[in-house]
Amino acid sequence: MELKFSTFLSLTLLFSSVLNPALSDLCNPDDKKVLLQIKKAFGDPYVLASWKSDTDCCDWYCVTCDSTTNRINSLTIFAGQVSGQIPALVGDLPYLETLEFHKQPNLTGPIQPAIAKLKGLKSLRLSWTNLSGSVPDFLSQLKNLTFLDLSFNNLTGAIPSSLSELPNLGALRLDRNKLTGHIPISFGQFIGNVPDLYLSHNQLSGNIPTSFAQMDFTSIDLSRNKLEGDASVIFGLNKTTQIVDLSRNLLEFNLSKVEFPTSLTSLDINHNKIYGSIPVEFTQLNFQFLNVSYNRLCGQIPVGGKLQSFDEYSYFHNRCLCGAPLPSCK
């Protein structure tokens, strides 16, 4: 009798879940409600077609659920045609660890202030959009961020110095915007990790902070700005820097006086006002890429290492640089 009742109960629950899928949903109902409101705010775009009220939101495209809590922990809308501003509703997904809007040319307006509510956020990527306005100071409140990418937008104004207060940041991308002003001095005083730093293709001016001498950047790209003066503070014999791009600025310093880390594999300093000679220590470095063209360098290119593996375009248009792969010195 007990076996029959147990079988009957199991069948009843099975048929109930078939007739009412909501009973078998893993998705948290509060999260589902917020997601459906986000879909509506974006005008029901095709990329969110799988977001239907009668299905489990843990199975929806562009979202993932935590395997233990079943709360939405990732919202990633990539290369789909969503239009308008980022809805404030994104701040009502309290368990988000990843938020991404990427390659959304019709996404406009400022960076949504409600994002500051997402204290558990680890990765924020708002890139290749038409977002405008400033880089907001409130981003420094997201202490769990390990990755911040605001590249390829229309952001303007100064870079907030408070971003150096993000203790877990592994990479900071602000490249390909319209940012102005100086690089914050505080970027030479990151309180935790030293992040890979990408500030290229902006309108930044002034000197590179001397505090950078204290930072050991693995990768740093400051190219295509209006930076002036001495960039030697980026380098150092005891650092572990691998990739440096300072090209197309107004930098002016003596290359032969710089101590370079043995870890350096890529150096691009083309189109500056850098003078001196190419250090003989370059023959000891395992360069995968090198470009020192369009500067004011003189003297013979040292022979050895990888230096002769690069063509003349890596060296030409200097004041009096000579030797292979350029013409012989006279």
Swiss-Prot record:
The keyword Zinc does not apply. Its main location: secreted. Mostly expressed in fruits, and, to a lower extent, in flowers and leaves. LRR repeats lie at residues 69-92, 93-118, 119-141, 142-166, 167-192, 194-215, 217-237, 239-261, 262-285, 287-309. It is found in: Secreted, Extracellular space, Apoplast; Secreted, Cell wall. N-linked glycosylated. Keywords: Apoplast, Cell wall, Disulfide bond, Glycoprotein, Leucine-rich repeat, Repeat, Secreted, Signal. GO terms for cellular component: apoplast. Residues 1-24 form the signal peptide. Glycans are attached at N106, N130, N144, N154, N238, N254, N291. InterPro entries: DNA_repair-toleration, Leu-rich_rpt, LRR_dom_sf, LRR_N_plant-typ. Pfam families: LRR_1, LRR_8, LRRNT_2. Disulfide bonds join C27-C57, C58-C65, C298-C320, C322-C329. Belongs to the polygalacturonase-inhibiting protein family. Inhibitor of fungal polygalacturonase. It is an important factor for plant resistance to phytopathogenic fungi. Homodimer. PANTHER family: DNA DAMAGE-REPAIR/TOLERATION PROTEIN DRT100, L DOMAIN-LIKE PROTEIN. This is Polygalacturonase inhibitor. It comes from Pyrus communis (Pear). The gene is PGIP.
